[in-house]
Amino acid sequence: LDRDDLDRWHLVEGDDMVDDGTHPLWDRNEVHEIYREWRRVFDRYDPSRSAVAEAWVLPERQYLYARPSELGQTFNFEFAKATWTYDDMHTAIEKGLKAAVESDSASTWVLSNHDVPRVATRYALPQIKATRYHQIALDWLLRDGSSYDEDRELGERRARAALLLELALPGSAYVYQGEELGLFEV
């Protein structure tokens, strides 16, 4: 696997800084010309190189990054943000499939990554709506596991079921290291 990791960097994030993709320095239209230039570089290789966007932006703009003339794929973080409820999962899947069609790209599915608590841990905690995604799990993590009761057996079963669902969906699945084992946050 030949790979370079071009990730976003946040130097400082204050309490007043939103992390939902609406900050004016994120998701600027000008970035798409840069990605089109990168695509031209990727296409000079034989075979052409692939790329995936780690774009924590508004869902309706996420698939702009996945166009064939740009990076080609983007992580579907709406799937990762879904709680273990039918409504959340169904909505994330339907939106992901629709957005992929609209951008002429493949659907992608991701349950977690290095920015959020592991899926087994999240699914072991109460599945209640919060004002920010993963708020319950982040609070639990920051309080050293003391803020909410954790049902590890339930979390492991849910995480494995979610992974099987992810792998059954059309498109590409991105499995974060340890997810296939149902590993918890440590």
Place the predicted regions along the sequence by residue.
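Active-site and adjacent substrate-binding regions of carbohydrate-active enzymes
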Residues: 1-186
